[in-house]
């Protein structure tokens, strides 16, 4: 995790890397995604957002507790719990999902697709509404999530979009 002042946004930003999650009511949260997925949760009534960044859905190996955030099967419940521990109300949670790019050759393992489908399935299981999904299969992206309005700015190599 890296905290810095972003001169373009004129804001304090916390950048998370694969395996990390962060919850805030003040700081913008950012990450860079390819095949990984970021789940961004918000409780607007409590002005709270959280973001995770997971690499794969699961692993067949034993995972040490400090590495669980790298796997969606752990990362999504961990983010939900972190939101609740920071004052969110589960019935207020809403989600936006990003990433899931497939850079590999046609016919190879589709890690990005598996990651994105898992996020949708898991949030549906938890009955958390998904307000936006950005799973364009061909583009990497950098995302910035804002706690005050749940706006997420997505920067692609060829432009910007707001969700």
From Swiss-Prot:
The keyword Hydrolase applies. Keywords: Chemotaxis, Hydrolase. GO terms for biological process: chemotaxis. Its EC number is 3.5.1.44. It catalyses: L-glutaminyl-[protein] + H2O = L-glutamyl-[protein] + NH4(+). The keyword ATP-binding does not apply. GO terms for molecular function: protein-glutamine glutaminase activity. It is an enzyme of class 3 (hydrolase). It comes from the Bacteria. Pfam families: CheD. HAMAP family: CheD. Probably deamidates glutamine residues to glutamate on methyl-accepting chemotaxis receptors (MCPs), playing an important role in chemotaxis. Belongs to the CheD family. PANTHER family: CHEMORECEPTOR GLUTAMINE DEAMIDASE CHED-RELATED. This is Probable chemoreceptor glutamine deamidase CheD. The lineage of its organism: Bacteria, Pseudomonadati, Spirochaetota, Spirochaetia, Spirochaetales. The gene is cheD.
